[in-house]
Amino acid sequence: MNQNRRLTQMTKSAGUAAKLGPDVLAQVLCDLPKIEDPNLIVGLETSDDAAVYKINDDMALIQTLDFFTPVVDDPYTYGQIAAANSLSDVYAMGGRPLTAMNIVCFPNCLDPKILNQILKGGADKVLESGALLVGGHTVEDDEPKYGLSITGIVHPKKVWANSTAREGDYLILTKPVGLGVLNTAIKADIATKEQYDGAVKVMSMLNKYAFEALENLDVSACTDITGFGFLGHVYEMAKGSGVSIEIFADKVPLIDGAKELATMGIIPAGMYSNKKHIENEVLKEQDIEDAIEDLLYDPQTSGGLLVSISEKDLPDALENLSLIESNGFSVVGRVLPRSDYAVYVK
């Protein structure tokens, strides 16, 4: 058994950058049978973060799963990041996780102690979330992969969908972008220690705390920023909600080092497919540096929440977020009536 191989060198892509591109997904999902059930609150149609099924007037189940390849070489840290990413979908729907189950793909050439550390990292994040880890499933694979299937709960009338953004709302982003670029640098072993530590801190932080800061405020819609990049998820929110969204490019928080690395051309392949998928739906209203534009399409791993909130509650939201440990949050846009383009970047 080889204990010295770097986990990130055993995979083609790292983290959420390993997802199939949005164009491919659209092709394979387009002719699946449509599900009609009066209790299905959120299903496939709006490309949301999780499914929501009404059990009774006071409770709905949230169901989601997520897994990916290593973004770091330390197995415990990888487990933490993968679990935080999986749990995020429940918070993005306005709910709380109840139970979690491990999803594991693991090469037989690696020491089982490595898998033990991955699972410990995941278990500690599940414990932090307040959910229960109740089982899982493993298969042998050439590339290591790890994540969770999560069941959560939410009140049926308090679901945060990605398709219900309200005209006049403002958008808050609760974590910086640029994680795909940093993960590419980490995989290539060119990230500095400061860049590595910064990326790990952002990716391993649960979105639980941002959710709790906002859960009692007037939120109309929410999604988490992952593999389709910041603008990709903004587009999904605009399209699903029948609105246009204006993004303040200079207000989008960037993780330290991301702009410099992007300027050097350290860009994950997923950025290009993300941009190709929606570039005809995005209008740049002014010149933007190439590196900044790339970062707006950069596939994120365990990114932040993008929250549509009323102007009335915006001050309370910002104050509440300022009271929690945060990696950086910002007002990044506003919701407009539907116009010629889904997304306007200024």
From Swiss-Prot:
Reactions this protein catalyses? hydrogenselenide + ATP + H2O = selenophosphate + AMP + phosphate + 2 H(+)
Q: Which positions carry the signal peptide feature in this UniProt record?
A: none
Q: Which GO terms describe its molecular function?
A: ATP binding; magnesium ion binding; selenide, water dikinase activity
Active site (catalytic residues): 16
The UniProt annotation places ATP binding at 19, 46-48, 66, 89, 136-138
As cofactor, the record names: Mg(2+)
* Group of enzyme by EC: transferase
- Record's keyword annotation contains Zinc: no
| GO terms (BP aspect) | selenocysteine biosynthetic process
User: Location of site Important for catalytic activity?
Assistant: 19
- List UniProt keywords, sorted A-Z: ATP-binding, Kinase, Magnesium, Metal-binding, Nucleotide-binding, Selenium, Selenocysteine, Transferase
- Tell me how the cofactor is bound: Binds 1 Mg(2+) ion per monomer.
Cellular component GO terms, alphabetical = cytoplasm
Instruction: Quote the record's binding site residues for Mg(2+).
Output: 49, 89, 224
Q: Which domain of life is it from?
A: Bacteria
How this chain assembles, per its entry, is: Homodimer.
NCBIfam families named in the record = PRK00943.1 (NF002098), selD (TIGR00476)
Q: Which HAMAP family match?
A: SelD
- What function does the entry list? Synthesizes selenophosphate from selenide and ATP.
PANTHER family reported for this sequence: INACTIVE SELENIDE, WATER DIKINASE-LIKE PROTEIN-RELATED, SELENIDE, WATER DIKINASE
Family named by the database record = Belongs to the selenophosphate synthase 1 family. Class I subfamily.
Q: What is this protein called?
A: Selenide, water dikinase
Give the originating organism: Alkaliphilus oremlandii (strain OhILAs)
